[in-house]
């Protein structure tokens, strides 16, 4: 009998990607986040689709339509809460997935890594335009502040900002186009995720040791399908706990007030997952400098593969690099905290020091640690 799984053109692709895929036998739970991100993306698209059925992208009715979804639509409150908190889970998984990639040297699969960075930027853009849609105070002022950064670009800045706005300020045209962007971008994310997977399957997965795993591989199914199913169950449990018991804990109270262009909130800040970048932006007193630092904080990820100096791929057996990695993690948590604080001392200086340390760690200290560890591994040491 011909095995359809291995011969059918479409089934064959699925089989080679999720069933008979040769996978290293020693990959840990840190390798679960790819599939969890896929699950998050599917949940977000489905919940978003149901929300879009009831949402109106008009400045006069957007806020009311979100209230209507939560009050009058069957299980609308649940769909809304899952979508809002699903974004937080998405970014949590994203940061852990990237952290894993840096720790275990997965960035040396350059194509996969670069597509991953483009994916991160696309997801960040999706989340930003999505945050504007409820048209609350923080939605409006967040959109105003962030889109205003475009005006810092020399010569074309103001024209570019007004082109994005569709007028002379954030208004009806901006909301309508942001809704259009928020609808289309997740499908671009799906396409990029498929390309990400395609490049990954060209090389095969990395593993915690960083050693070539070709001599010891096992089929993806049933071993890792079961493992992924467990991860997804735990993710769903965490999401439901957050959405049902504490749905507004990660949001901003200002967003419960309708957008008012005449009243600026005392502290304008984005959602928690953008706070680290926002802190870097604010740490430079110059507008253009801040914008460049903001861009550099994300785009620096693209040059991480070029800064790899160690003879070993993974940090598993490199204690100095490990220490620096965890300092970087603590530094990012510090930046996240600072991003949510008012612009006053001592927060200003802490933010500036943390921003400096962020770039110093990635550009200087970690490459130097790799060279030092190479030297320490020499027999004469």
UniProtKB/Swiss-Prot annotation:
Tell whether Electron transport is among the UniProt keywords. yes
Which coarse location class describes where this protein primarily resides? mitochondrion
Query: What are the required cofactors?
Result: heme b
GO MF, one term, reads: ubiquinol-cytochrome-c reductase activity
User: What is the recorded membrane topology of this protein?
Assistant: Multi-pass membrane protein
Instruction: Provide the binding site for heme b b566.
Output: 97, 196
Q: Which CDD domains match?
A: cytochrome_b_C (cd00290), Cytochrome_b_N (cd00284)
Annotated a ubiquinone binding sites: 201
Q: Which PROSITE patterns match?
A: CYTB_CTER (PS51003), CYTB_NTER (PS51002)
Q: Which GO terms describe its biological process?
A: mitochondrial electron transport, ubiquinol to cytochrome c
Q: Cross-referenced InterPro entries, in alphabetical order?
A: Cyt_b/b6_C, Cyt_b/b6_C_sf, Cyt_b/b6_N, Cytb/b6-like_sf, Cytochrome_b, Cytochrome_b_C_euk/bac, Cytochrome_b_N_euk/bac, Di-haem_cyt_TM
Q: State a GO cellular component annotated for this protein.
A: respiratory chain complex III
Give the UniProt family note.
Answer: Belongs to the cytochrome b family.
Miscellaneous comment = Heme 1 (or BL or b562) is low-potential and absorbs at about 562 nm, and heme 2 (or BH or b566) is high-potential and absorbs at about 566 nm.
Q: What is this protein called?
A: Cytochrome b
Q: What is the species listed in this Swiss-Prot or TrEMBL entry? A: Murexia habbema
**Gene name as annotated:** MT-CYB
């Amino acid at each position: 009998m011909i095995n359809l799984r291995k011969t059918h053109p479409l089934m064959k692709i699925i089989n080679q990607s999720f069933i008979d895929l040769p996978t290293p036998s020693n990959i840990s739970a840190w390798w679960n986040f790819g599939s969890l991100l896929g699950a998050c993306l599917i949940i977000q698209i489905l919940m978003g689709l149901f929300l879009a059925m009831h949402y109106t992208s008009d400045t006069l009715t957007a806020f009311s339509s979100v209230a209507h979804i939560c009050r009058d639509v069957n299980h609308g409150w649940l769909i809304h809460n899952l979508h809002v908190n699903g974004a937080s889970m998405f970014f949590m998984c994203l940061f852990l997935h990237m952290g894993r990639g840096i720790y275990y040297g997965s960035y040396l699969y350059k194509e996969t890594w670069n597509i991953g960075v483009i994916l991160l930027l696309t997801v960040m853009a999706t989340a930003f335009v999505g945050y504007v849609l409820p048209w609350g105070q923080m939605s409006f002022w967040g959109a105003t502040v962030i889109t205003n950064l475009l005006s810092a670009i020399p010569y074309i800045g103001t024209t570019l900002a007004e082109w994005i706005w569709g007028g002379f300020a954030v208004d009806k045209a901006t909301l309508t186009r942001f809704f259009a962007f928020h609808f289309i971008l997740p499908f671009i994310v799906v396409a990029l995720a498929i390309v990400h997977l395609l490049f990954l399957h060209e090389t095969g997965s990395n593993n915690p040791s960083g050693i070539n795993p070709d001599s010891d591989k096992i089929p993806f199914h049933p071993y890792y399908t079961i493992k992924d199913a467990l991860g997804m169950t735990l993710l769903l449990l965490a999401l439901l706990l957050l959405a049902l018991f504490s749905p507004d804990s990660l949001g901003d109270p200002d967003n419960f007030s309708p957008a008012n262009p005449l009243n600026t909130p005392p502290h304008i800040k984005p959602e928690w997952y953008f706070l680290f970048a926002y802190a870097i932006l604010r740490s430079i007193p110059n507008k253009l400098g801040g914008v460049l630092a903001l861009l550099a904080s994300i785009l620096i990820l693209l040059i991480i593969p070029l800064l790899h100096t160690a003879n070993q791929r993974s940090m598993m057996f490199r204690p100095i690099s490990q220490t620096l990695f965890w300092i970087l993690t603590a530094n990012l948590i510090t930046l996240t905290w600072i991003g949510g604080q008012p612009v006053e001392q001592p927060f200003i200086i802490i933010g500036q020091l943390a921003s400096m340390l962020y770039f110093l760690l990635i550009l200087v200290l970690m490459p130097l640690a790799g060279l030092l560890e190479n030297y320490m591994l020499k027999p004469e040491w």
